[in-house]
């Protein structure tokens, strides 16, 4: 199954895209420049985690950065997440610019392995490895050089994307070996 996800932001304001994905609502009707998590998420908000909890799911969020960023800790709670794992929950992680996508996916697998038997699990993992900007000083193991490009930022972006693709393959291969039906939505 595949489709398109149209987002209302570009280049900043990740939390607004998260809000739209988790609630099914648009930020179009909020004031221009709003940060929904910081300005409007004060009470319980109808969202996918709250709905899934009513169906018996345990709902967890992972973001390997500070929970204070964009007021995620409070916002995730208002959406119904049972637990929110932040940078503090990663012990000696691998870094690729930031905490690597593979480390974040290892945390997803850890949560799956440790879940209560028979209880369905929803994990929302907001990775951070490829967060902008695209400085050009990373020492890549296998750099990707765009043919004909003289922009070092392109090499940085594409090299980071390749490492992310490899990490995503690691996650998919793990769940392909599990008997329990699993949906990975990227």
Residue ranges of model-derived segments:
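Solvent-exposed soluble domains appended to multi-pass membrane proteins
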Residues: 1-186
């Amino acid at each position: 199954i595949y489709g398109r996800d149209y987002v209302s932001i570009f280049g900043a304001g990740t939390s607004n895209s998260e809000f739209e994905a988790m609630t099914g609502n648009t930020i179009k009707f909020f004031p221009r420049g709003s940060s929904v998590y910081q300005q409007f998420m004060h009470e319980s908000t109808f969202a996918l985690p709250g709905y899934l909890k009513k169906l018996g799911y345990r709902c967890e969020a992972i973001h390997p950065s500070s929970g204070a960023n964009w007021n995620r800790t409070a916002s995730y709670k208002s959406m119904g997440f049972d637990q929110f794992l932040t940078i503090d929950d990663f012990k000696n992680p691998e870094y690729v610019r930031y905490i690597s996508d593979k480390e974040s996916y290892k945390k997803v697998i850890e949560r799956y392995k440790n879940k209560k038997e028979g209880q369905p699990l929803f994990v929302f993992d907001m990775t951070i490895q490829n967060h902008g900007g695209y400085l050009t000083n990373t020492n890549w193991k296998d750099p990707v050089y765009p043919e004909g490009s003289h922009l070092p930022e392109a090499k940085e972006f594409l090299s980071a994307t390749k490492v992310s693709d490899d990490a995503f393959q690691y996650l998919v291969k793990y769940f392909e070996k599990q008997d329990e039906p699993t949906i990975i939505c990227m």
